[in-house]
Amino acid sequence: MTDGRQQHTRRAPTTDIYDATELTRAFEQLMRTKRFNSLQEQSRSRSRTQSPSHAQPYHTPPHPSRAPPPPPTGAHYPSSQSPSQQHQQHQLPASSSLRNLPVFPSPPRDQQSLKFRNLLHVLSVTPTKYENPGLLDEALSLIPLDRLYSEAEEESQIMQAQAASVGGKPEWGYQDCVIRALLRWFKNSFFQFVNNPPCSRCLMPTIAQGMTPPTPDETARGATRVELYRCSESTCGSYERFPRYSDVWQLLQSRRGRVGEWANCFSMFCRALGGRVRWVWNSEDYVWTEVYSEHQRRWVHVDACEGAWDQPRLYTEGWGRKLSYCIAFSIDGATDVTRRYVRSPVKHGAPRNRVPEEVLVWIIHEIRKKRRESMSKTDQRRLMKEDEREEKELRAYMASALAAEINNLIPREQTSGRPGEQKTPASMQDTPVDWVAAQQMGPGQSGPDRSQDGR
């Protein structure tokens, strides 16, 4: 028996009994089966209580998606469902928020869902403004192209040499290096972060006085709101206005602002250099940029305000923020990219209660259809394959996080080695602070949490 226990101990590191991948697959299959059975039970309950004369037709998703057809869109059935069924139906959106389970697109009907739909449609217009040829020409005239291309060429050659020495592939391509050079120049030389603007008369610090209506000239320049500040010097007492411009033309002139202005202007610069750009909106009042890497065939997180490149876990694991919705908008449509930035919904996810998940999927498909309806069939198929590839990537993040959680629940046995020697749990080996420190490289250093400053 002793030999058997010792032999089992030696095999523990390589045993397949607690294979995290298999546990993840089994858990996901269990949840899919549970949801499918629940939907079948709801369907049978409705068919028994609903008269055929009152049945309503099916609604087909507006986007020619690969999703299954949606369920019947009838009214609510409070009298035909037991309290337990109603509670189960209420809990379904929460269990499907990971988006690894089937979600049937459903159009918004209640006032709150319609309001959120209108908000996303308004936000989706932002990246379309970057397609103005005159704006792009003006941006190119301000960018030191020779300097950026030289830096990108040098960095690209270094990466190629490093990859050749180990027989691998360079981490980033030349176009990625161009955007990285742009990021460094934009943060260090072009744009200025403003908290309280200094007094224009005596250059002393100012004190916030609240909001004030924009002047006609400020409105014409795209200012949606204006902050008012008073000079802290008693002998001066002058007031300073800080218009919050959303027009990129004006940002090229002012070259200052907070996170919102930084992300808006930098995204346009990326577009001017020929990059595919996303403007990412976060419901916790923060924004950033994503650029598409043809080299890695994926979207890359870029935060110009922080000088951060490909650090999607910065906000949650780095700053300890809780995020609910992260929606990326581009000229090709919209995508819910929350799973890229919230790897552990339990630890870092805020409640997603603005709309049901199936309504959010419907809105995303609606925006995509609107942006792509004038495209050629070839481009539509290309984007659809790209959507599928990204969906696979986002699901992998959730599967990995789930596997890690399951793995942490498994009791750790002492492995063969020195008596009393124990390995450090995986959850303690890489803390958020260590991870952020390791990611502070390349374009710049990640600074303090600016999300409290607002957009």
Curated annotation (Swiss-Prot):
Which residues are Zn(2+)-binding?
A: 199, 202, 231, 236
Which family is this protein grouped under? Belongs to the transglutaminase-like superfamily. PNGase family.
Q: Read off the InterPro entries from this record.
A: Papain-like_cys_pep_sf (IPR038765), PNGase (IPR050883), Transglutaminase-like (IPR002931)
**Originating species:** Aspergillus fumigatus (strain ATCC MYA-4609 / CBS 101355 / FGSC A1100 / Af293) (Neosartorya fumigata)
Q: Where is the composition biased (Low complexity)?
A: 38-53, 74-98
Q: Does the keyword Metal-binding apply?
A: yes
Q: Which UniProt keywords apply?
A: Metal-binding, Zinc
Keyword Metal-binding tagged = yes
Q: Which Pfam families does the UniProt entry name for this protein?
A: Transglut_core
Q: Which GO terms describe its cellular component?
A: cytosol; nucleus
Which residues fall in a compositionally biased region of kind Pro residues?
Answer: 59-73
* Protein name, entry field: Protein png1
PANTHER family noted in UniProt: PEPTIDE N-GLYCANASE PNGASE -RELATED, PEPTIDE-N(4)-(N-ACETYL-BETA-GLUCOSAMINYL)ASPARAGINE AMIDASE
